[in-house]
Amino acid sequence: MADKKSPLIAVSVGEASGDLLGAHLIRAIRKRCPQARFTGIGGELMKAEGFESLYDQERLAVRGFVEVVRRLPEILRIRRGLVRDLLSLKPDVFVGIDAPDFNLGVAEKLKRSGIPTVHYVSPSVWAWRRERVGKIVHQVNRVLCLFPMEPQLYLDAGGRAEFVGHPMAQLMPLEDDRETARQTLGVDAGIPVFALLPGSRVSEIDYMAPVFFQTALLLLERYPAARFLLPAATEATKRRLAEVLQRPEFAGLPLTVIDRQSETVCRAADAVLVTSGTATLEVALCKRPMVISYKISPLTYAYVKRKIKVPHVGLPNILLGKEAVPELLQSEAKPEKLAAALADWYEHPDKVAALQQDFRALHLLLKKDTADLAARAVLEEAGC
């Protein structure tokens, strides 16, 4: 293992949201330990912070049971390779960020060899597969939780866990500023604007983008001056979006695909259509009304539905304990229903104002110095 003044910190992420968390974590660790070095699996944002990625993070960005099965041989090959590489490099600590099905297996093998392990972002054990808690406690030395209801589950099982807040709540301003967002993006102040967030993975684009674009066409019939904004999380998703938009049915759709900038896009919008996942929380922290949707393979959906233990799938609804925003999933994810739900938000500003009060309270609950708290915990495990 490295000199504690220049610790080697291994990090592994599976998708765009993890890449963002990883980049913030690296920055916060460097403030406390400027000579720290980083390796593992990371995306473009982490690489921009000087991270050395041993494998292509995009190859891990798959969703759904059926989709994972198709790619399982490659995913297992990458995991075996990462474990082999890290056992050779002997990092001072391993941090798995989200992607629990991949990262916890890596952590378990490294912990067994004496390498301290941290899992950053608790799996949704409060929602489904709660029996995993005991196994996670065995696999990692410490869990860093983004939501306040999570640590007690691990403490009750004899593990170590702490609530570090959510990094988006820390980084995003409490106050709303639609005018500045529209100026930044060059969008007229007086027209209807809808944001489309079909997902950060290519597999999500395949399922959701056609439905979202069909929804946009219906909204355009209702609001001819409307514009649509779509933030592309990665170059891979941007390429796939371009392919979908080339279909004749979407010709002339007034849609602008923007590199990343999802927060600015959401703030510029009157309402947002979003695929279920971390992005729903970002929309809530932007204080924007939304409609949550999701479509996966029927087999995956049947499996998930049997296992899930909470009445909602969207993070804002789960955290608020009520259906504050509509969820139109699977067979309900039809363009007609999605368009009607978005129009309902656009045409009822009184409902939007009440929702924004709920979202402000949620923002205050989750707001902590997340990156610094996480960095402190990681360096403590590394013995620094």
Curated annotation (Swiss-Prot):
Pfam families xrefs: LpxB (PF02684)
Per UniProt, the keywords (alphabetical) are:
Glycosyltransferase, Lipid A biosynthesis, Lipid biosynthesis, Lipid metabolism, Transferase
What enzyme class is recorded for this protein? transferase
Q: Which GO terms describe its cellular component?
A: membrane
GO terms, biological process: lipid A biosynthetic process
What's an example of a GO molecular-function annotation for this chain? lipid-A-disaccharide synthase activity
NCBIfam families the record matches = lpxB
Its biological purpose: Condensation of UDP-2,3-diacylglucosamine and 2,3-diacylglucosamine-1-phosphate to form lipid A disaccharide, a precursor of lipid A, a phosphorylated glycolipid that anchors the lipopolysaccharide to the outer membrane of the cell.
The protein's name in its UniProt record: Lipid-A-disaccharide synthase
State the organism named in the record.
Neisseria meningitidis serogroup B (strain ATCC BAA-335 / MC58)
